[in-house]
């Protein structure tokens, strides 16, 4: 009798994606983050669904509805903090996943990579509109500052901002539409994830050496299912530790104050996972220039495959490129730190230097060093 998983139309798709999928035999734990992102997405959709059952997207009741969830709903506090810290875990996994792609040259699968960049932008948009929903001080002022950046667009800027706001300031209409966006975007992310996987399974996975592994494949199940379960347990352990022991560690205390248009917080800053981009935005004294730099800091990922000058795909055997890669990571950590600091000396100059280094590393140094390494191959 033929196995049902190989004959049933639906089971066949799942089988080819998660069970009989031929996988390189040497992929490391850096390849775990894809499945962890899937797990994060499922957790966020489920916790978000339960939160939406009790939340009211109205300026007069939004803040108190979140307080009600935490105080009166059974395990409401737990669901709320799982959702908030789940977003942080989501971004940790995202950045690790992108870092893996950069290090091992996975960006050479261009369709998969471009869908991935689109996914990153969608997740960032979802996180931004979600942060506005509790209607605390940082929610309100974060929404005001970030949406206001669109006014830097010549001619249509102001009209565009007022169109997004649904009025002349961030108000009831803004909150309602942001809730609608926050509800729909995760399902768009789920659809994009399916396309991401579709393109990946057209080519098969990359591996740490960057060398084709067609002659050395093993089935995904049981080898990588068990490996992914171990990764998932680690993720859940960290998430639970964060949620139960330090739920507000990554949040902003200002968000426990209800939104007040008449009182600006001393330091307006986004959640930690946006700080690097925020630092790049602030490092340019011109509004339009800052907005362009902010956009480019993310969209630069699209150009990575075009900047590949090395004859080797992976950085595994390229020590000089490795050095630059880890310099880039250190630079991003510096930018993250700067983004959370006030705009004063010496943070301004450090942020500007770190921003210049970020673009210089990706656009100039890495391609140049790759060419030098090509020359060294002939020695």
UniProtKB/Swiss-Prot annotation:
InterPro entries: Cyt_b/b6_C, Cyt_b/b6_C_sf, Cyt_b/b6_N, Cytb/b6-like_sf, Cytochrome_b, Cytochrome_b_C_euk/bac, Cytochrome_b_N_euk/bac, Di-haem_cyt_TM. Keywords: Electron transport, Heme, Iron, Membrane, Metal-binding, Mitochondrion, Mitochondrion inner membrane, Respiratory chain, Transmembrane, Transmembrane helix, Transport, Ubiquinone. A ubiquinone binds at residue 201. Its cofactor is heme b. It is found in: Mitochondrion inner membrane. One of its GO terms (cellular component) is respiratory chain complex III. Heme b b562 binds at residues 83, 182. GO terms for biological process: mitochondrial electron transport, ubiquinol to cytochrome c. Binds 2 heme b groups non-covalently. One of its GO terms (molecular function) is ubiquinol-cytochrome-c reductase activity. The chain crosses the membrane at residues 33-53, 77-98, 113-133, 178-198, 226-246, 288-308, 320-340, 347-367. It is a multi-pass membrane protein. It comes from the Eukaryota. Its main location: mitochondrion. Heme b b566 binds at residues 97, 196. Heme 1 (or BL or b562) is low-potential and absorbs at about 562 nm, and heme 2 (or BH or b566) is high-potential and absorbs at about 566 nm. Component of the ubiquinol-cytochrome c reductase complex (complex III or cytochrome b-c1 complex) that is part of the mitochondrial respiratory chain. The b-c1 complex mediates electron transfer from ubiquinol to cytochrome c. Contributes to the generation of a proton gradient across the mitochondrial membrane that is then used for ATP synthesis. The cytochrome bc1 complex contains 11 subunits: 3 respiratory subunits (MT-CYB, CYC1 and UQCRFS1), 2 core proteins (UQCRC1 and UQCRC2) and 6 low-molecular weight proteins (UQCRH/QCR6, UQCRB/QCR7, UQCRQ/QCR8, UQCR10/QCR9, UQCR11/QCR10 and a cleavage product of UQCRFS1). This cytochrome bc1 complex then forms a dimer. Belongs to the cytochrome b family. This is Cytochrome b. It comes from Cephalorhynchus hectori (Hector's dolphin). The gene is MT-CYB.
């Amino acid at each position: 009798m033929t196995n049902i998983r190989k004959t049933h139309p639906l089971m066949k798709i799942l089988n080819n994606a998660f069970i009989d999928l031929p996988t390189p035999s040497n992929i490391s734990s850096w390849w775990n983050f894809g499945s962890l992102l899937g797990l994060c997405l499922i957790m966020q959709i489920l916790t978000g669904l339960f939160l939406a059952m009790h939340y009211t997207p109205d300026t007069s009741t939004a803040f108190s509805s979140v307080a009600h969830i935490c105080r009166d709903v059974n395990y409401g506090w737990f669901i709320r903090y799982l959702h908030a810290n789940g977003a942080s875990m989501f971004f940790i996994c995202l950045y690790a996943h992108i870092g893996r792609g950069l290090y091992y040259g996975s960006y050479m699968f261009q369709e998969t990579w471009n869908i991935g960049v689109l996914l990153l932008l969608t997740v960032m948009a979802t996180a931004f509109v979600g942060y506005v929903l509790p209607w605390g001080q940082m929610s309100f002022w974060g929404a005001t500052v970030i949406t206001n950046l669109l006014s830097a667009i010549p001619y249509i800027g102001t009209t565009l901002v007022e169109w997004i706001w649904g009025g002349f300031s961030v108000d009831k209409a803004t909150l309602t539409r942001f809730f609608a966006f926050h509800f729909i975007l995760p399902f768009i992310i789920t659809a994009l994830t399916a396309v991401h996987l579709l393109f990946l399974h057209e080519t098969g996975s990359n591996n740490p050496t960057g060398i084709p592994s067609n002659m050395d494949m093993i089935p995904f199940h049981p080898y990588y299912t068990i490996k992914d379960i171990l990764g998932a347990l680690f993720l859940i352990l960290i998430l639970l530790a964060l949620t139960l022991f330090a739920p507000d560690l990554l949040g902003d205390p200002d968000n426990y104050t209800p939104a007040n248009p008449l009182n600006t917080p001393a330091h307006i800053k986004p959640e930690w996972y946006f700080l690097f981009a925020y630092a790049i935005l602030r490092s340019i004294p011109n509004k339009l220039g800052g907005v362009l730099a902010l956009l480019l800091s993310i969209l630069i990922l699209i150009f990575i495959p075009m900047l590949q000058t090395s004859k080797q795909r992976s950085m595994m055997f390229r020590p000089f490129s490795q050095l630059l890669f880890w310099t880039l990571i250190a630079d991003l950590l510096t930018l993250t730190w700067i983004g959370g600091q006030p705009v004063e000396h010496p943070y301004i100059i450090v942020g500007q230097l770190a921003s210049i280094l970020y673009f210089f590393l990706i656009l100039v140094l890495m391609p140049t060093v790759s060419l030098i390494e090509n020359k060294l191959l002939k020695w």
